[in-house]
Amino acid sequence: MRFFWLNFHLPYACRDSGICCTSGWPIPVERSSVSLIEDAIARKVIPLRVEPWLVPAGDPPDDVAGLLAVRDNGHCVFFEAGERGCSIHSVKPAGCVHFPYVCLIDQRGVHVTLSHYCPTAASLLFESNDPIAIVEGPAPVAGDSIEGLDARDSLPPVSRDADGKLMSFDELDRWQRDQVAGAKIDEFQSDDVALFERARAAVPPPWTWPEAPSQVESLCWSLVAPKWHFFSDALTRYAAAKAYASWALYMGDGIDAAIESARIAAAVLRVEAARQCGWSGRELDRELLTEAIRQSDLLLVHYADPQLLATSSKDRQQD
C-alpha cells in the first residue's frame, strides 16, 4: 500500500502537547487493549487516580469494550499533568494512536492529512519554506490497521467536464494536484457566515458550536484583514490541507462537494479568526491565527459529522 502526504506535513512527530489527552473526548477502547492496559496498571507503571478507568459505552461495536474514563476537568485518566506524554503510550487505544492523522483510503492508496487542532500539526503550517507538493511518504502508524474513510470499493467521482462520465484515477490525481497547487484563502467574503452556519449545522447533538460573533464582518475588516497577508504562506498551506484528501469526494457529490467543503473551511477559519481577535481585542498575530486554525479543525474534523458536512451543499441546492 502506498501512502501520500502533503510535504509540509511529513515532519510531523508528537511533541507531547497533551491536547489529545485533555479535550474530554469519548475514546473507545478495543477489547484487545483491555488486558494490555490492565497489565500495565498491575505493574504499577501507571499512577492511576480514577477508578474505574474503563466506563460503559452506549451500543458500542462488538470489538469495543468501553470508553476511557475522564476526570471532572475532561482530562483522560491516564494523563498526568506535568509529565511527558501518555501513561499508556505503548498500549493506548487506536483512537489515540491515529490522532491527529486523517486518512482517505481509495484505490490509489492512503492519502494522509492532519487535524490542525493538534498544536504541533498547526505549527507545521508556519514552518515550511518549500513549495507545496503531494509526496509519497511512510505509513502514519505502525502495522496494517489504518483508520479513516475507506473508499476502496467506491468508483471515482464524475468529471465536471464530461456529463455522466467517471474520472479515471489518473484524472482524479491530476485534479487533486491542481486543487492543491491553486489553493488559497482570501479575506472576508459576503457568504462567510452562511457557510459557517452550514458547518455548525453538521454538528450532531448533544454537541454544539457557538454562533459567529455578532460583529464578525466588522471584526474581520478592522482586526483580521490588516494582518491577513502577513500569513499568506501559512494560510495557503491550510487551504491546501483542506483541498487535499477530501472525504467529500466520496461522501458527497464528488468534485463539487470537495470544492464546497474547502470553501466552508475557508469561511470557518475567517470567522474563527474574527472571534479570536474580538476576544483578545488586538489585531491578528501568529498566536491568534494558530488558535483560529485549531478551533476551525476542532469544528470541521472533530465536531461536524463528515457525511452531513459533505452533503450540505447538495441539500441546499435542493431546498
Language model: regions and residue ranges:
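Short Cys/His-rich Zn2+-coordinating modules
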Residues: 1-4
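Polybasic, low-complexity association/targeting segments
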Residues: 6-58
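Short, compositionally biased low-complexity segments
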Residues: 7-18, 147-152, 235-244
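Conserved aromatic-histidine-acidic binding/catalytic patches
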Residues: 9, 25, 84, 88, ...
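Local cysteine-cluster metal-coordination motifs and their immediate loop/turn environment
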Residues: 10-26, 71-102, 115-122
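Gly/Pro-rich turn-and-neighbor structural signature
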Residues: 45, 49, 53-78
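Internal, well-ordered alpha/beta segment that forms a basic, Gly-enriched binding/recognition surface
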Residues: 89-180
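Hydrophobic, aromatic-lined core segments that form the binding pocket/scaffold
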Residues: 158-319
